[in-house]
């Protein structure tokens, strides 16, 4: 059994959350789901509500829970929780991605440019402005 819990940050009703909950249960890993919205939490009694409109408020709630329960990792389920998860991990002194990595993981253009520049095979692409009338 793990000595701490994993903090899973998920948007309300993410279809991905169930897979994380199932995996943690199967591996006997304690999991706390931090989610926003009105839907029931995936783990009754093991979840916390966070404010999606304010990172500061969400982080305050996470800090309060962390003062009573040790977290060993923080994971996001979706693009919409990647940046908050990075901030939470840093706040809790857990391993975290650099802000540049967070940006690249949630921006396809930046990710493809980084891959191309590093010599990683990537599909051809070009930036297109939606309001571009030159073509």
Regions from the language model: what does each represent?
Residues 107-135:
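Active-site nucleotide/adenylate-binding loops and adjacent lid/helix of ATP-dependent enzymes
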Residues 1-101, 105-110, 117:
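ATP-binding N-terminal substructure of ATP-dependent carboxylate-amine bond-forming enzymes
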């Amino acid at each position: 059994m793990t000595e701490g819990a994993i903090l899973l940050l998920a948007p309300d009703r993410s279809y991905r959350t169930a897979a994380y909950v199932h995996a943690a249960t199967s591996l006997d890993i304690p999991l706390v789901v931090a989610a926003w919205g009105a839907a029931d939490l995936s783990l009754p009694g093991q979840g916390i509500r966070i404010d999606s409109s304010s990172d500061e408020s969400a982080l305050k709630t996470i800090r309060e829970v962390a003062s009573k329960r040790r977290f060993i990792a923080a994971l996001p389920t979706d693009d919409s929780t990647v940046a908050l998860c990075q901030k939470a991990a840093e706040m809790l002194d857990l391993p975290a991605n650099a802000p540049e990595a967070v940006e690249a993981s949630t921006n396809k253009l930046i990710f493809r440019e980084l891959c191309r520049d590093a010599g990683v095979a990537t599909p051809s692409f070009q930036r297109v402005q939606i309001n571009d009338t030159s073509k």
